[in-house]
Amino acid sequence: MADLANLIICLTPLQALMAQRLMAQREQPFDLLMLCYEDADNAKFRHYFQVASAGSRHAEYVLIPQSKWRRELGLPRLLRGLDKEYATAFAASIDNPNVQYVLNRIRFAALETFDDGTGNLIPGSVLYRNSSNRQRQLMNRLRGIRLQTEGLRRLSRRHHTLYPGQPNIAAPTVPLDLWAAAGQGLPEGGQGGLRQSEGREVLRSENVAVNECGLNERLPEKNMASMAATNPVPTRTRRILLGQPLLPNAADNAALAENLLRCFKIGEYFPHPRETYRVSGAEYITSPLIFEDHLLESLRREPDTRFEVYHLVSTAALNVYAFPRTTVYAVRPAEAAFHTPGVARIYEVMAQLGIPIIDIE
């Protein structure tokens, strides 16, 4: 097997960044396959494909059609440029039918998985179980997909994760650190470097006086007094809201975001790539970078600035909570969508990391 290359399959910019790190850790050559749905194809996806492909032997960027029948007819294109056999296949979105198609059509000696996002942390999510949809099961048989989600989980000999210490889709887990090294040497401004969890803090509106938005008037602060004497105190604060289209209706998502902007007096908005609506009341941040990389660049450019990041259940916020001069706040609205077991699990992880959770009415 020594002469065989490895294959790594990505579906998102974050997965491409993880792929870059995984390839850099190994001497063996890699082929890279990045799959992108047509409606998600944008500069951000293309940028991270270029970043990851620089470390590969061969790279393919394949657009997945929106039309169901075009997708079916185009399945063989997913194999274009790939070898018939690989030493190790690496995949994150093992529930995705396109990823499953490729993994069922090639041969590999070993399989390793890595994080799809926070879905890995939710037992019972689509990354843990086979689809129960009868049409999907029929299509899998027609496509020759024998290995599905549960079978791929069992095959995975290890799982590479951004969230060590948390249960995941396969064991053992191996920590994958994307940003700690990049954050070293950043001006700290009253805090240490990339920090560990500083304890659980959950704010509930019934515990203290609330303002007209139904939330706590006083937000929690990290304890920086002990370090202020040795590090310069930031003179400016930027508040950023991370967009997330979590509600089924675009208008409801926009209204929720605008309410959060107003309630927390947030001046900037970083949209999610899947957003199809426009939010008013804040300056849009337009960047080819994912939020984690954008924030690192901002920390370098603005050594006198402190950043407050507000979000609902964002993977990006989980990834930046330990950045210097950065405070992350998780907001939990009263809507039922934010109290399902899966979402509750993500809020639980955030609390374990020491991210303050603010309940609003």
Residues covered by each model-derived region:
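Active-site regions of enzymes building and remodeling cell-envelope glycoconjugates
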Residues: F49-Y61, F108-L111, R129-S132, G267, ...
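Active-site and donor-binding regions of nucleotide-sugar-utilizing enzymes
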Residues: L7-L138, L142, A316-N319
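Catalytic binding pocket for nucleotide-activated donors in carbohydrate/polymer assembly enzymes
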Residues: A317-E361
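Donor nucleotide-activated moiety binding/catalytic core segment of transferases
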Residues: T276-F323
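Short, hydrophobic beta-strand segments that form beta-sheet elements in well-ordered domains
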Residues: I8, A89-A91, L111-T113, K265-H272, ...
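Conserved catalytic-core segment of nucleotide-activated headgroup transferases in glycan assembly
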Residues: R238-E275
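Short, charged/polar "capping" segments at the starts of alpha-helices
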Residues: D39-H47, N98-V99, L121-I122, P248-A250, ...
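A nucleotide-sugar donor-handling region in carbohydrate enzymes
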Residues: F114-G117, L121-G190, R195, G199, ...
